[in-house]
């Protein structure tokens, strides 16, 4: 750690303020000395940095968490080391508090509980999908952050919580009396599933969610033979009994695989039945009160001729009604002969008024031709065909071997597709899904918003590259505009300047004056110099989807079949190229390969289009 005039630095980050101490890190607010943006550093204590068991899990978790972005998870920007101390660079947040502190003196409504539980279930499912789990979910490990005054779930210990169990108990014992420590640890143990040491972390997380949901609803933990939530909250809208009991099953396989699907609303009939059952139980519990007789007035106060009220209600007589057929019962018209003579003066004129046929002119809709939005054109650069070198010896294993390929000439957009281009496509198709229900873009991860049914681009972002687009969205847009996505080979050749075979699109080196990388956001397209072929933003700004499926060893096959390589015929991932605004310098190399699921959504994913030359 470097000291300069009593100012604490961690690498390029100047410490501004100390934040709340976490279980596994010292959190400090910092500012980057060059880009002047604030970050939160999570600095590992020396004992954890020297622990092989912890560091083994730490490295795995960090790599996996860095692949996803969610407001409820720590947004990892970078990981660094200084003097044998590791620290994580994360985005600045508005501050969080533990759920235990948030609930202190506060009773949540069912709507608030549903909002928090559904958020928790959503982020846990996302974490489970990448092979991680939370573990040790409780009132202290779950935090809340505040966005526009609304409490939202925040999980700062995903992946580490199970390793910190003993550290957490030790911290409790040091800060509280023996009696308080025992009570606190007891309340933490209730969240642990019977098989807490099991490797089926999805099931243990589901158990803890059930305990948490019960506590939020009832205000107590489900110890022993606990009462069902429906008996405590008879007017609840959601079927908490089924949700909580399924989460608390002793057998792991009996717990729900998808937590969000397990929480469902009651039907109206079930809600009514719950209320009726509660009323019946309340009536049974009520003590039978003795009847209070009516006080008898003194005879001296009763005037002659008056009767004393005895308080007895007259019994209502039952009236026998002759049954009629259903057809007779449904007749509701009034027969004029049945109307009394006293009503004849106004009934007949009224009937004649109602019998008149209203004269209504026929409405003819004026046919208007619907004007569909038309695509905006983008200038394209012609890439001359020929023989090119592909791959690199300085990168990852999937970039080998270096080999020659042959490509025909093709056209490529000079810059990535922008928000103003893509919003026209969304207006044309009228939604964010294709005909196969594939998501094309997730608006909350983009700079395009839907307000009152209209698509609006955030101010100042019209010329920025569109982000949050899936491979399906990129491919669909390209087809709509009469183009296609470039192949991985075409993209690499274009980035490397054709036959020049440059290391970076900008030449043999790259710096922040030539590309947007390791920054805080996208920049408008064409903000940096073009490469030697006249293509902009081939390095940094956004990752760009390519047409090909990804294969780790595809370059070996490409070396054997060098004519117009198109990638494997099928696969799990699609190729992404070019690095992005948050990438490190190495990710901007022309040969660097990236990949993700075609339905993956990220605020760093965009695309540009290509076209064959006929």
Curated annotation (Swiss-Prot):
EC numbers, comma separated: 2.7.11.1
Keyword flag ATP-binding: yes
Record carries keyword Kinase: yes
Annotated GO MF terms: ATP binding; formylglycine-generating oxidase activity; protein serine kinase activity; protein serine/threonine kinase activity
Family matches, as Pfam families: FGE-sulfatase (PF03781), Pkinase (PF00069)
InterPro entries named in the record: CTDL_fold, Kinase-like_dom_sf, Prot_kinase_dom, Sulfatase_Mod_Factor_Kinase, SUMF_dom, SUMF_sf
Binding site for ATP: 19-27, 42
Disulfide bonds: none
Keywords: ATP-binding, Kinase, Nucleotide-binding, Phosphoprotein, Serine/threonine-protein kinase, Transferase
Reaction equations catalysed: L-seryl-[protein] + ATP = O-phospho-L-seryl-[protein] + ADP + H(+); L-threonyl-[protein] + ATP = O-phospho-L-threonyl-[protein] + ADP + H(+)
SUPFAM superfamilies reported in the protein's UniProt record: C-type lectin-like (SSF56436), Protein kinase-like (PK-like) (SSF56112)
PTM comment text: Autophosphorylated on serine and threonine residues.
Class in the EC hierarchy, top level: transferase
Residue intervals of the Protein kinase domain: 13-302
Protein role: Together with the serine/threonine kinase PknD, may play a role in the specific interactions with host proteins during intracellular growth.
Protein's name in the database: Serine/threonine-protein kinase pkn1
Organism: Chlamydia muridarum (strain MoPn / Nigg)
Origin organism lineage: Bacteria, Pseudomonadati, Chlamydiota, Chlamydiia, Chlamydiales
